[in-house]
């Protein structure tokens, strides 16, 4: 299992300290949720903060854009060489064009689906996608509890997009991770389960063995 710690779940007063604590740990990428309240009711990181994080961390960066116009960020992001950029299917008028713009940054391109969004209408993009991310909780600020039925959606993604890498994000505890791994998830974004633990290395090791 490839893990991606989500910095938005860390204590915002201690981001520098948290980055240092992650420096020597083994995981796929440091995950940054970019939110500006245009798509969900929250604000996370601006470009100055993203650039500061990129300067400090030795890890690759993955980005999850939870905003209405992610394309405005791509030129600036290209300078920090992102590993992955995910955008929400629900926000895109011309998804193929957006995926091409993502690749121009040097990043791998992915689509994100909220729990209520069906995936079938997007199968025509299979050859253009590197990854598909399933939101396994509602990104609504109401507790973001894991939705067990999203395991079925993970299975559908593995069938509909067999050449892409399957990600899960949202409310992932160790118990939820076991279910998601059994369903076929290859990558997991972990937030509170990691940053609320007392031993980051041990917590990552527990998840990684799934």
UniProtKB/Swiss-Prot annotation:
InterPro entries: Aldolase_TIM (IPR013785), Ribul_P_3_epim-like (IPR000056), RibuloseP-bd_barrel (IPR011060). Substrate binds at residues 6, 64, 140-143, 169-171, 191-192. The active site is at residues 33, 169. Pathway: Carbohydrate degradation. GO terms for cellular component: cytosol. Keywords: Carbohydrate metabolism, Cobalt, Iron, Isomerase, Manganese, Metal-binding, Zinc. It holds the Pfam family Ribul_P_3_epim. The keyword Electron transport does not apply. One of its GO terms (molecular function) is metal ion binding. Its cofactor is Co(2+); Fe(2+); Mn(2+); Zn(2+). PROSITE patterns: RIBUL_P_3_EPIMER_1, RIBUL_P_3_EPIMER_2. The keyword Coiled coil does not apply. Binds 1 divalent metal cation per subunit. Active with Co(2+), Fe(2+), Mn(2+) and Zn(2+). Its EC number is 5.1.3.-. Belongs to the ribulose-phosphate 3-epimerase family. Probable pentose-5-phosphate 3-epimerase. This is Protein SgcE. The gene is sgcE.
